């Protein structure tokens, strides 16, 4: 009986185990075919046919265990488990074919140069160094130096691997000096890894160092362009500022090119607005096959490749010569006709930006040594990567201009692109290096011009703020800043010509519309611009639209409050839309809200936010360690690199993190400590007179003079059913205990439970400045979303007479 019972339980255990594994596989498979909303959401394989074995290992790698523990959905956990097992079992790495670039010569691989004197202060190979205490050897060192494009590799001191391109000044020593240390990669072999101050040098397999060619500026000509190329302009859109996108589209539109629009799968408002634009023009296509293109995600490359595939199947679009991608924050800084001429003259070449520095360092900074996996709208780091022996890596920017021949090769089923696509599913920021790497390992290596013809507004000390990336990627990276008055000089005409650069980024009309105007006047004929139009300096960005976004109680409270200010008897039905308005780059942001009443009437309101900040009247007391406190503000959805809150309305709910920003200005008496631009301060958070929390805010380094504290409202506050007043006191650490604060900020917290308090809050923090009650009346209000805005309006299509979109 005992034997039979044990057998039965064993059978049950087997069945349960098989059922569990089947469920894991099905969950993973489901994750690969998830649809988001009404859009076709593409999985990371994007059509690649792969066979995924079931996970069958114990995860021991700390990175993988951490990633799996942080994943939210079962399907994501299953995906990470599967890939971590493949990595552990050695089935993750792919063997690549031999490099087909003419600069590669297999006869040069491991060709010995000799043994040379080498010292720390006078290295022979100076470009890059790897420390490989467990794996160093000829094959390993050669692999690392080859992937970075170096001509030579050298072994020394057992665990040291050096890379470089020049051995002309090397001093030869006796070969026995390079046989002092066995290679740690295989202690039982007779392979040696150099000596003490002696490096043994070999060839990696490249014939010569590559000198990148760059395009040169072509001056405007009255002669028409012969056989102009057909460009597929790919607009990769995010956000809700559709007016800026339409303004950009108007600046680059020519009827003989194609415009292919991809909108992030999470941005349904932008998608709906772009659909309206596509209805007017046959050469504009908006794809319904949408990806969530998170920062650094594999999905960005998958989207780009899918656009190539899909565009070749559309009859009206399939004969393009180039695909060139842009974002919602790009703008031309030279005429589009000049750009078209340069591309045509260089037809056949692809335009790729180089990283501009040592390739070994680039590989290191980009995280190529690690395996990443995208799911749950995040890039998880799951382990170290084992690179194949013969893959040359390069990269730079993910803003590219790809010729048709290279584009077709990239989606083909040939061995190199097929295997590279698979490998790049697990590489961070894949579009920044995929086409570089594909070209440098193929016959296309000589068909490159190393410039993407763009100017990027880098300020890395400010743009490399990792805090904003923590929720979406297990890595730290950089993003460019928005052009402002002080950085517009970067794209002045002569500078743009000298590079040449035909486009620049980033532009944001809600931050500084003047920079867009400067670029526009440099790239577009003045007669096509309506510089004197009342809304020329206006910037709008949508916040809410009915049918797309979820109605929120505090929005409805504001709508009711606004409606009651008109003394109408009409009853509120729903909010139709809310937009942020900035009348010029120095103006405060205003709110434009459009609502519908129960009788079908519409009202549109201009609403001003009221600040509740009390600064001490004695300016001398606002100076702390030589820094003058100029302003205090608060908000949510904080953007670290631009130092502003993207929630323009000023609402704080129990689901938000409150960000309080101090604006400092250095005086002549400032005592700077390092690079810091602000002093240490104390923030006291109060509910009425009750102290909730006190935090010490350390000095901060900001190009804009900002200093911040983040406070999670939901975690810090509870039982928000009463009409409480909340405050932040800004206090100097050197002040006596009874001294008044330098400043006090007053803010409300809106919850569904304290809806009866909303009117009280709204009365304190908002003012109804103006309103209109019909479509015709609102068209006369300059602040209304119905008022004409010719710089971005597209209501008809292409006008042959003016040669513009109208």
From Swiss-Prot:
It comes from the Eukaryota. It is a single-pass type II membrane protein. InterPro entries: Glyco_trans_14, WSC_carb-bd, XYLT. It is an enzyme of class 2 (transferase). UDP-alpha-D-xylose binds at residues 264, 293-295, 398-399, 479, 505-506. GO terms for molecular function: metal ion binding; protein xylosyltransferase activity. Its EC number is 2.4.2.26. The keyword Cell inner membrane does not apply. The keyword Transmembrane helix applies. GO terms for biological process: chondroitin sulfate proteoglycan biosynthetic process; egg-laying behavior; heparan sulfate proteoglycan biosynthetic process; heparin proteoglycan biosynthetic process; morphogenesis of an epithelium; reproductive process; UDP-D-xylose metabolic process; vulval development. The chain crosses the membrane at residues 12-32. Catalyzes the first step in biosynthesis of glycosaminoglycan. Transfers D-xylose from UDP-D-xylose to specific serine residues of the core protein. Required for vulval morphogenesis and zygotic cytokinesis, suggesting that glycosaminoglycans play a central role in vulval morphogenesis. This is Xylosyltransferase sqv-6. It comes from Caenorhabditis elegans. The lineage of its organism: Eukaryota, Metazoa, Ecdysozoa, Nematoda, Chromadorea.
